[in-house]
From Swiss-Prot:
HAMAP family (alphabetical): LexA
Species, as recorded: Brucella melitensis biotype 1 (strain ATCC 23456 / CCUG 17765 / NCTC 10094 / 16M)
Similarity remark: Belongs to the peptidase S24 family.
Catalysed transformations (reactions): Hydrolysis of Ala-|-Gly bond in repressor LexA
A GO biological-process term: proteolysis
Site feature (Cleavage) residues: 126-127
Function of the molecule: Represses a number of genes involved in the response to DNA damage (SOS response), including recA and lexA. In the presence of single-stranded DNA, RecA interacts with LexA causing an autocatalytic cleavage which disrupts the DNA-binding part of LexA, leading to derepression of the SOS regulon and eventually DNA repair.
Active-site positions on this chain: 161, 199
Protein name: LexA repressor
EC number: 3.4.21.88
Highest classification ranks of the organism: Bacteria, Pseudomonadati, Pseudomonadota, Alphaproteobacteria, Hyphomicrobiales
GO molecular function, one term: serine-type endopeptidase activity
NCBIfam families named among the record's database cross-references: lexA
Pfam families (alphabetical): LexA_DNA_bind, Peptidase_S24
InterPro entries the record matches: LexA, LexA-like, LexA/Signal_pep-like_sf, LexA_DNA-bd_dom, LexA_repressor, Peptidase_S24_LexA, Peptidase_S24_S26A/B/C, WH-like_DNA-bd_sf
Length: 240
């Protein structure tokens, strides 16, 4: 599990190596992560090396090699630099009452729509569960290929419990509405009919586990009648 800064630095090094074949300098890494001193970069590199994500090559200046990336990182994903979240305000209530908009099918023999409108329903906790969304705030226009078929809605992420899955506070996530999920999928889960959270779905025997992607948060176990899946993650939007 990586912290947000470790995650950002690993991506920055990976992208620089992919683009130029040369690792970034400590000054470049410090600037990219907006840190005050290079000592912070030294600590992050040591932590990444201890966790087996990178290694320092002997007898070569600035020599770093990326050994692996977290499973959640798709190839080509760019690191955050001075990230400024796009905050989407929303009122709070039950997810269960959300009525997402289903895009109307295009008429036969006509061109497919350039965009699909998806309702933004407010906020969802990626941390300790909070009361979840009820009222639509506005619409997002998205390319159809981003979401595919089905009913969808969007939420603003609040919290840091999913950072090792590449989901950060302030991100906007796209959820495909549904009441089932496979183990390992990231879902919007309604707990006790009143609290919603964004977590990875697991099964522990007859119980349901809601698993964070941040070692600072414990996996929470519930009886099957206490958790209702409200949809699963299919996309993410981040503004820089």
């Amino acid at each position: 599990m990586l912290t947000r800064k470790q995650h950002e630095l690993l991506l920055f090094i990976h992208e620089r190596l992919k683009e130029t074949g040369i690792p970034p300098s400590f000054d470049e890494m410090k600037e990219a992560l907006d840190l005050a001193s290079k000592s912070g970069i030294h600590r992050l590199i040591t932590a990444l090396e201890e966790r087996g994500f990178i290694r320092r090559l002997p007898n070569r200046a600035r020599a770093l090699e990326v050994l692996r990336l977290p499973d959640s990182i798709a190839p080509g994903l760019s690191p955050q630099k001075k990230f400024a979240p796009s905050v989407i305000e929303g009122s709070l209530g039950k997810v269960a009452s959300v009525q997402p908009v289903r895009p109307a099918p295009a008429p036969q023999n006509s061109e497919a729509p350039a965009t699909v409108s998806v309702p933004v329903m407010g906020r969802i906790a990626a941390g300790v569960p909070i009361s979840a969304i009820q009222n639509q705030t506005h619409m997002l226009s998205l390319p159809p290929e981003m979401i595919g078929a089905g009913e969808h809605y969007a939420l603003e992420v609040k919290g840091d419990s999913m950072i090792d899955a590449g989901i950060f506070d302030g991100d906007t996530i796209i959820i495909k509405r549904g009441d089932t999920a496979n183990p390992g999928e990231i879902v919007v889960a309604l707990v006790d009919e009143e609290e919603a959270t964004l977590k990875r779905f697991r099964r522990e025997g007859a119980s349901i586990a809601l698993e964070a992607a941040n070692p600072a948060y414990e996996t929470r176990i519930f009886g099957p009648d206490r958790v209702h899946v409200q949809g699963k993650l299919v996309g993410l939007i981040r503004r820089y």
